[in-house]
Amino acid sequence: MSLDINQIALHQLIKRDEQNLELVLRDSLLEPTETVVEMVAELHRVYSAKNKAYGLFSEESELAQTLRLQRQGEEDFLAFSRAATGRLRDELAKYPFADGGFVLFCHYRYLAVEYLLVAVLSNLSSMRVNENLDINPTHYLDINHADIVARIDLTEWETNPESTRYLTFLKGRVGRKVADFFMDFLGASEGLNAKAQNRGLLQAVDDFTAEAQLDKAERQNVRQQVYSYCNEQLQAGEEIELKSLSKELAGVSEVSFTEFAAEKGYELEESFPADRSTLRQLTKFAGSGGGLTINFDAMLLGERIFWDPATDTLTIKGTPPNLRDQLQRRTSGGN
C-alpha cells in the first residue's frame, strides 16, 4: 500500500464521571515507525470500505480556519491537534454516550492525494499467549469497529473549494448521534447525498428503458448490466461515472443515457460513489417488517411471484425446498 505519513498526533480523552472528560495531550508528535504506519494503513483500509456521508465546511468552521492556518505554516500540526482535541472534548461532553478514547490526527498521502484523518479509537482488552505458553491480558485498538471517524481530502479542498464531497464521515451505529456531534466539531454541513444519487440513477434507468419501449426481459437485462458496471466500480473503490455507464448502455436507445438523464432533470453528478444497498434494488426485491422478511430476484416478479396492488397480496408459486420441508414438518405435526 502506497501510504506515506506526513505528521501524526495522538491524544486521549478519559471519562472520569458522567459530566467530565479529562484531556491527556501529548507534547510531541508520534514517530512514523513501521508499527504506526501499519496501524494507519489498516485504519485507511477499514474506513475506505465503509459507507460514508459527505460534507463540506461552513464559513464559520473553526476547525477549517485553524486547519487552513496550519496548512499555510502559521501553526504547527501538534498545536493544531491539541486545540482540536479540546474542541472535540467540549462537543462530546454534551452527549450522554461520550465514552472517551484515543484521538488520532493523521496527515498522510495515499496515491498522490493528501488526507487529514481524525478518529476516536477505543482500547479493548483481550488475551494473548506468550512465548512460555502462558495466557496474559493484553490491550488493542478497536480499529474494525471505529465509528467516530472523519477524513478531509486536503487535495480536493484546496484545489476545488466549491466541492461538496471533500469531507467524509461515518454516521455511526443506529441510536447514536455520532454524526450530530461530529458535524458540530467539524463545523460542517451535509454535502453530496450519495444514497440520493444512487436512487436517482435507478429511477433514470427505469425511465430510460421504459422510453426505449423495451420488453420485460430486455429491461431486466439493462438493469443487470447497470448493476454489473456499478458493482465493479464499487469493488475497485471507484465511483460511478455517467459517461462510462452511458457507453455500457450504447444501443439501448437512439438517445445516450447521459443525454437522457440531463434532459429529464435527474440532477445526477458526473460521478458519485456507489451505494451497495441501493444498487441491489436493480436485481432484487427485499423488505422486512411485522415478523416477515422477503428477498427474491427481480426476474421472478410476474413469473413465479405475483403482486396484487389492490389487495397488497404477494403470491409465490413454488417455494424453496428447505422452506417447503419446514412447512410440511410443521403442518404434519399439527403445531
From Swiss-Prot:
Recorded GO MF terms: double-stranded DNA binding; identical protein binding; single-stranded RNA binding
InterPro entries: Nucleoid_associated_NdpA (IPR007358)
Keyword Cytoplasm: yes
Subcellular location per the Swiss-Prot or TrEMBL entry: Cytoplasm, Nucleoid
Electron transport recorded as keyword: no
Keywords (A to Z) from UniProt: Cytoplasm
Cellular-component GO terms for this entry: bacterial nucleoid; cytoplasm
Domain of life of the organism encoding this protein: Bacteria
Transmembrane segments: none
Record family assignment: Belongs to the YejK family.
Name the UniProt record assigns to this protein: Nucleoid-associated protein YejK
Source species: Escherichia coli (strain K12)
